[in-house]
Amino acid sequence: MSENLNREPELNIGYITQVIGPVIDAVFSAGQLPKIYNALEVKSKDGTTIICEVQQLFNDNRVRAIAMSATDGLQRGVEVIDTQAPILVPVGKATLGRIFNVLGQTVDNIEIGTGEDRLPIHRPAPSFTDLETKPAIFETGIKVVDLLAPYRRGGKIGLFGGAGVGKTVLIMELINNIAKAHGGVSVFGGVGERTREGNDLYMEMKESGVINESNLSESKVALVYGQMNEPPGARMRVGLTALTMAEYFRDINRQDVLLFIDNIFRFVQAGSEVSALLGRMPSAVGYQPTLGTEMGALQERITSTTQGSITSIQAVYVPADDLTDPAPATTFAHLDATTVLSRGLAAKGIYPAVDPLDSTSTMLQPVIVGSEHYDTAQLVKKTLQRYKELQDIIAILGIDELSEEDRLVVDRARKIERFLSQPFFVAEVFTGSPGKYVDLENTIKGFNMILNGELDVYQSIAFYLVGDINEAIAKAKTITN
């Protein structure tokens, strides 16, 4: 942008004709209209530069743009400069360990170098010929995820869960594991959520070592925030800023990238606000008529290419728990897997509190994961489902009233439930237990041994918060002795 400002003769200058909240109308000379999605610079009275993005062109040499920050102090007649490019954000190693806003400006009081690479936030999705077509499992090292609802490399995962069930810790563990096991990096896009949550996440990341304060380039994550106090334009575009940073790591550095979007519903909500401000006719339930297109433009860029992959984990808020609401319904069409966090499991102290029966994945097919993995997962689910059905009888009559066969099912299900828990690396600080990464082969082996009855002699408490099955057996022997 600064380059454009230095070339005086080519400056394309217009003037504000109207300001309505975050919406600005500006008039330019005939034949000099900025393109759609171009960034416009406006200087406010106090000297701050406000960036707006062109949304509509009118036939009287007028454009309508949406501001990325507050428009306080703007008035008619103020100069508007067309930067002749979309919003450009910094990319690459310099972004690691840092916090950015929608415009790629740092908000952590540490300056970023001027020579950094920058890319526009509006880019085409990878072409069909560049896509990686063979489905591959993205191993996370988290037993419950890898066994029952495996993630697809370059796929999209919906993360469902209320407050206080462990979303943040699960997100941080995934960031940690992708860095260690895949040599990858992560980008976190905070879209329209609470500023306090963004601050807490940053502090927890520093505490757990995900962000290395003494050497920022050794950090494993870049953070981009457009929180709920921001104008709708910023909340609508912050997801694209985070995605652009992730694309650079995938396409140029050829890395596997994890992209977190918290919350994808707020992206839709911001788009709905902008749509209303621009005077578009609302669609079902008051959402924008372009809902499907906007969601598709974001989701289609999240994919595996021959260079690397972007695997996206998106927190999904379901308004009024209505899954048929157009916002979550449109999101579901793009998801490959869902990870549902259960308050009931969290109350039992089973972490990660991933619900083994509600979480799903399109990858759990014998052709993709192999018959051993598939059969083990189905048998685990069947055992847990039977245990769930028997819980009412146990609560009323007690376990002694069950048949011998059902008692065996309950015993194995309790072992499975506890074995699905796991100590996390990022939780070491407050649990005191060292974290464990369990590869898929050991995960399948462990659950098979429980299902086959090889471990019936051991107490179920030995399976709680352990890594692989050998650790559980060693713990069980210690308890017995």
UniProtKB/Swiss-Prot annotation:
GO biological process entries: proton motive force-driven mitochondrial ATP synthesis
Name listed for the protein in its UniProt record: ATP synthase subunit beta, chloroplastic
Name of the gene encoding the protein in the UniProt record: atpB
Family, similarity comment: Belongs to the ATPase alpha/beta chains family.
Organism of this sequence: Dictyota dichotoma
UniProt-listed NCBIfam families: atpD
Keyword Ribonucleoprotein: no
Binding-site list for ATP: G161, G162, A163, G164, V165, G166, K167, T168
Quaternary structure (record): F-type ATPases have 2 components, CF(1) - the catalytic core - and CF(0) - the membrane proton channel. CF(1) has five subunits: alpha(3), beta(3), gamma(1), delta(1), epsilon(1). CF(0) has four main subunits: a(1), b(1), b'(1) and c(9-12).
Keywords assigned: ATP synthesis, ATP-binding, CF(1), Chloroplast, Hydrogen ion transport, Ion transport, Membrane, Nucleotide-binding, Plastid, Thylakoid, Translocase, Transport
High-level lineage: Eukaryota, Sar, Stramenopiles, Ochrophyta, PX clade
GO CC terms of this entry: chloroplast thylakoid membrane; mitochondrion; proton-transporting ATP synthase complex
